[in-house]
């Protein structure tokens, strides 16, 4: 597969949350915008975490058992965040995230600033587009 930059397939407009955003407000936003998660920023715009639908579901189910549902994004977000550059090769990124078992969208950073996000569907689109244009792989076969 040819080299494809992250910047060619990333989403430029990124929905973000702050740590003090109400959890159910964040869930409502994710459902409304049909996104699976979003980066969490501090007041200076630095990425301090990421909130995924999986984080929400896991924590809410656990919290409902103890009758402690609710809270803020900061209570539920994942603080270990994998970030990538717009110039990174998507195939290398895909290889890296599958080896690490990373299942969240990946913030794309340029000079310390959030410039986009790359999701699993974005990566799958690369594979689909490559297959469609070259006739190679299952998509292009008769």
What residues fall within each predicted segment?
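A generic helix-loop boundary/linker signal
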Residues: 16, 20, 46, 66-67, ...
């Amino acid at each position: 597969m040819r080299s494809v930059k992250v910047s060619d397939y990333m989403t430029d407009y990124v929905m973000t949350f702050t740590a003090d955003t109400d959890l159910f407000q964040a869930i409502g936003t994710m459902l409304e915008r049909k996104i699976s998660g979003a980066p969490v920023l501090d007041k200076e715009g630095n990425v301090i975490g990421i909130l995924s639908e999986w984080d929400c579901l896991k924590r809410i189910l656990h919290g409902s058992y103890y009758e402690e549902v609710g809270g803020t994004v900061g209570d539920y977000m994942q603080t270990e965040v994998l970030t990538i550059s717009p110039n990174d090769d998507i195939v290398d990124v895909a290889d890296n995230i599958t080896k690490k078992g990373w299942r969240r969208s990946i913030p794309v950073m340029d000079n310390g600033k959030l410039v986009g996000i790359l999701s699993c569907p974005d990566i799958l689109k690369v594979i689909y587009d490559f297959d469609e244009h070259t006739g190679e792989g299952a998509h292009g076969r008769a």
